[in-house]
Structure formats: C-alpha cells, structure tokens
Amino acid sequence: MDSRPIGFLDSGVGGLTVVKEMFRQLPEEEVIFIGDQARAPYGPRPAQQIREFTWQMVNFLLTKNVKMIVIACNTATAVAWQEIKEKLDIPVLGVILPGASAAIKSTNSGKVGIIGTPMTVKSDAYRQKIQALSPNTAVVSLACPKFVPIVESNQMSSSLAKKVVYETLSPLVGKLDTLILGCTHYPLLRPIIQNVMGAEVKLIDSGAETVRDISVLLNYFEINHNWQNKHGGHHFYTTASPKGFKEIAEQWLSQEINVERIVL
C-alpha cells in the first residue's frame, strides 16, 4: 500500500474531467492537480514549447512526492509522454492509447472520428495508435481550436458554444459511429457535441478510459492507497487566477476545493 498522491497535469481545467472520473472509480486515492491556465491553450503552440511547459509541471509534481503522474492533456501526451515516461522511475500515463483502444472496441462501422487541438491532430498520434491496433479502421481527424477557449472562459452552456460546436463538427455528421473526444476539455461540452453528432454516435472520453488504466497500474505495482490510512486531502494548483479555476472546478467536481496559484 502507498499513501502518496497521484499527480495530474493539464494545460488548464480540462484535466479535471479525468479527476472527476478518478474520484468516482478510485475515491480512496489522493490527487494533486496542476493546470497551466496562464499559458493555455497548448494546441496552437510549437511542440518544443509544449514539451518544455509539460516538463515544468512534471517537475512541480515531483516535488510533491507523487507515486504516479497522469498527463491529463492530449496535446502534452502527443508531444511529451514518451520522453517523460522513459526518464522517470514512477509510472507515467497519457490519455491517447486508452482512448484509441476504447474507440476500436466501440465502432461497428469501422469509421472513427477524432476531434482535438491543432497539435494533437497534427501529431497524428491517435490515428497511428488506432491503425496499429486495427489497420482496417478508417480514421478522420478534425482540429477544433475554438473549443478550449470556450471551456476556459466557462461558457460551456452559452449560445456561442452551441454555435461554435455546430459549425465546427458539421463536416463529421453522418460519417462515423464513434467519436473520440481527443482533448480533456471536450467532455465539458459533451451534451452539445452529442446533440450535434446525433444520439447514435458513441462519444469516447479518453480521460475516463485512462482512469481504468490507472487502476490497473496501481494494482500491478501494488501502490494502491489503503482505505484505513486517511489521506491529506486533494490539492489543486493553477498558474492563473485561483478564482476562475475554482469556479469551473467546483461546478464540474460538485465539491468545494482549495486552489493555489503558482509560478512555474
């Protein structure tokens, strides 16, 4: 048993969708989360800069003595996960492989769509993973650069959100039966995305799928938290306004949290 926390990182608040699923599936585990809101979104940035920012968050989490790191950001996973995984001596998970695997299991038509940030789509990481596992699966990718700013500005239920999602996703409607939400911000827009795509399209939340892998690794390495040892509580950090982060986080997680601002 291991009472150390699990570290989560993201470019902003999107990774909270993974944390929410973590609270549901593994409530005994302690979470330390950092969101780099001051520099979000990561999607339009060059790969080297994304790699640098991701390492800064990783190094911050390491100072908190975490037992595992979850890169709860598709863009950072696509650019930096492999390198970080190879250099650290604790488990490091990304969100792309779990989402790709779930999509393959879900599709009946063999037609899968991926929506993500420009960098995630440019990296081609999802398509490569899917076609390595299932070569006959047809994959179409679409960058959605306007989605993250809508979530980060807490406009998920606005008429603007509905308009942007409809206009962005229209080219995909009727062309697939499974759609990967290839950015951890996107589940916060899930009701609108589902409405645009149609009830028959299965939406894959890569973050939720990742939590299943977290559970497997905790058991494999025997580093689960013991229910009998009460943990020190969850800790949330942002590089921007704690007030803005707290508002979105409490709304999404349905619980009060404490948020600290840090400078990386």
Curated annotation (Swiss-Prot):
It comes from the Bacteria. GO terms for molecular function: glutamate racemase activity. Keywords: Cell shape, Cell wall biogenesis/degradation, Isomerase, Peptidoglycan synthesis. This is Glutamate racemase. Its EC number is 5.1.1.3. The active site is at residues 73, 183. Substrate binds at residues 10-11, 42-43, 74-75, 184-185. It catalyses: L-glutamate = D-glutamate. The keyword Isomerase applies. Pathway: Cell wall biogenesis; peptidoglycan biosynthesis. Provides the (R)-glutamate required for cell wall biosynthesis. It comes from Streptococcus agalactiae serotype III (strain NEM316).
